[in-house]
Amino acid sequence: MGDTEIVPLRVQNVLDSEIIRLNLWSMKFNATSFKLEGFVRNEEGTMMQKVCSEFICRRFTSTLLFDVSGRFFDLVGQIDREYQQKMGMPSRIIDEFSNGIPENWADLIYSCMSANQRSALRPIQQAPKEPIRTRTEPIVTLADETELTGGCQKNSENEKERNRREREEQQTKERERRLEEEKQRRDAEAEAERRRKEEEELEEANYTLRAPKSQNGEPITPIRFTRGHDNGGAKKVFIFEQTPVRKQGPIASSTPQQKQRLADGANNQIPPTQKSQDSVQAVQPPPPRPAARNAQFASDADLFAVPKAPPSKSVRNLAASNVDIFADVDSVLDTFHFESTPGRVRKPGRRNVSSPSPEPRHRSSSRDGYEQSRYSQRYEHDNSRWSRHNATYRRHEDESRMSRKRSIVRDDFEYSRRHDDGARRRDYYDADIQGDSKRYRGRDASSSSGRSVRFEEEHRRHGDEYRDPRGPRDYNDYGRRRNHANSRSGEDEEKLNAIVRREKELRNRLQKSQKASSSSYRHRSNSSDAEESLNEWDIENQELLDNSMMFGDGIPKRSNARKDKFVKKQATRSKPANSTKSPAQARKKKRASLEDNRDLNDSIACNRPRRSCVTPVAKKITWRKQDLDRLKRVIALKKPSASDADWTEVLRLLAKEGVVEPEVVRQIAITRLKWVEPEQNEEVLKQVEEVEQKRRRGAVARVKENVKMHEELREGGNHRAEDLQSGVESMEDYQPEDVAADQSLLALRTPIVTKKRGGTRASIMPKPVEDSPMSRGNNSTFNSPRLEQTKAKDIETNFKYVQHLSMMQARPSSRLKKSSSMNNSTYRGNKNTSISLEKGTQKALKIINRGTTIHEDDENEDNDDDDDMREEDTSIY
């Protein structure tokens, strides 16, 4: 390494010196030099503390100064103007020191001094070569300015040699220090390894199984096990009948303290068995002696001591080792002292109650699996109480049992094994621990199905009728013996008997409940009795449905927060055939019918299927801005009036989803768009009405018919002979292009067929819209704005036929009176003529729909037909 790359030692030491940075500083000067004062933060950074320098001996830069004590001062802040003015420094001089100490600082300070201070002023002396510093290593000050600038002159031969020796000494010291640290590290690792081996040997020698020790001499808290739920059915089983009490006794031979005493052999009588054991072990080198500890007596942990043979580390005499092991076991067992023997609390046995379930108990099953399956994964364990082989199979089975189609099943269907039900869960809990094996837990206490609860209650009430008490308790054996013993007819009879018995029980229960309220029941009216009974049975039916099979197998019951609203049923009454019955008899009959209805409702409610879905809520129609803009454009295009026909057309053009009524669109236009009905003149309205009348069906035919009737009346007796014989005119009287002409039924005459009672909805003609040229009925095909030509033609033909028949019936009954003196009311039609027009329309519809003949002479039948037609609401006009 070349000498040119070596920095002088004095420079290195100066660079390692302390640098103090002053944020706010001031100057104190005298005749010799000046000192710096400032404030720096303390080591904690919580407060500022004042720092004063020694006499400044060197200026490196305007902000870096060096004092005689060997400290550097970095002026990072500003000068304290107020303090300097207070000390008598003029402002112009303070401005010169605003950016640090200038090069002419001595002249500036000299100009500030008084005459006396100037006479005593002496030049600033240079700092000594090596200032005294509290450092352990040799430190030299900075070189002189001549040496720093000279380059080659500052490094003399002696100085180089001295620097080399110092570097070698430092390297030697550093090498020795590293070797010492490495040696200490290796010794520490060896000591840690030795301690670890000692602890392992002690653990192998101390082969006692120990329970967790109590801290600070407190008694051991007994371990508690909790069974069942936290609220109900939980009980605590304590391991100890009472807390064991520590008692000082002889030291156990398995403890390390006793082994240490045996090894020492001082002031102790060593048994011969232990002496022989020590003599055998004397061949091996003794293990390192552990640290001395206090004597350890038999504690709570020794209650669980189970001695075992320590692992052999060397070849021993087998007979001698066996003797030593047994002697050690005897010594351990002889040295234990108990105040009382720990015992387990056993609850007194429950009374011998027969289990309600005919399924055999598994008394050997532990409760640990139950606890684990209950608290870790409740529904995923196949062996737990809640698991089942196939949830879908059980659910479909419940749905099939709840369907309307009832099938007679064996009475023991629930208790017989099905083909795919081998791994199905049991209907009852497993047997509990001692003294609790006969405990019954109904499935209604857990999230189980109501089906098993219902059958279990039947077994509890009528167990003798279902099985032989001396018979087997297994389901399969019981089902096989029953199938072999009884025939199919016997099973059906027993099933019916069970149903009858349940109905009798229900009837008795209802009668008991009615007797309690019989006194107040007599004073009530029949209507209130009917309503209250219906409401009561609606509530009970709902409860039965909630407890039925559909809410079982893990499905929780409905919460009480949302209860169904029961609608009161209106009791429909028919007029009594015999009005001479007394009120008491009527009330008695009413009670009997109510009782029958209750029985029927109960039997139906037990097996009524649940609705698979709820009635969907009507979708709320929202009118957005784009919908309102479209409606605005349609209204501007169509300019509708207040008529329904105009708004129907607006609704069709708008095609808003969910809107089917034109009144809704009209109200939206009024409320949201501020639409106002346009005002029209009477003349314009009359013209529109005339145009509408001309557009209506049959208007042209009616005008032609009136003209022809007027001409015939004016001609007199020039009528044809066939007009006297037939009330229906022939096809010759009409031109082919006439709207009122018929092409099929009128020419061929309507065939007379037998009268049919009733009719279907499909046979009713669609009702035409009066203001629309196109007819629309209830059928979906007629609601379409675009109809096929064939359908439109058929509809037009049918209506032509109806209008023609109505006009034929509207004529005067006799055409023989050909007087020319008839007034206008004669041929225009009077009151009777208008009545016959309505009747003719209705009868024409009857002919088309039902194929019936017209009997004009039967007035009663006409009245009945009028009533029927009003009920069917098939009138055209």
From Swiss-Prot:
Its main location: nucleus. Residues 856-871 have a biased composition (Acidic residues). GO terms for biological process: cell division; chromosome segregation; meiotic cell cycle. Residues 122-315, 338-535, 549-604, 757-785, 808-877 are annotated as: Disordered. The keyword Ion transport does not apply. InterPro entries: Knl-2-like_dom, Knl-2_Myb-like_DNA-bd_sf, KNL2-like, SANTA. Residues 511-520 have a biased composition (Low complexity). Residues 20-107 form the SANTA domain. Keywords: Cell cycle, Cell division, Centromere, Chromosome, Chromosome partition, Coiled coil, Kinetochore, Meiosis, Mitosis, Nucleus. It is found in: Nucleus; Chromosome, Centromere; Chromosome, Centromere, Kinetochore. Residues 251-279, 573-583, 775-785, 819-836 have a biased composition (Polar residues). It comes from the Eukaryota. Disruption phenotype: RNAi-mediated knockdown results in absence of hcp-3, hcp-4, knl-1, bub-1 and lin-53 at kinetochores. Also causes defects in chromosome condensation and aberrant meiotic and mitotic chromosome segregation. Residues 156-199, 359-385, 394-444, 453-480, 592-601 have a biased composition (Basic and acidic residues). Residues 617-678 form the Myb-like domain. One of its GO terms (cellular component) is nucleus. Interacts with hcp-3. This is Kinetochore null protein 2. The gene is knl-2.
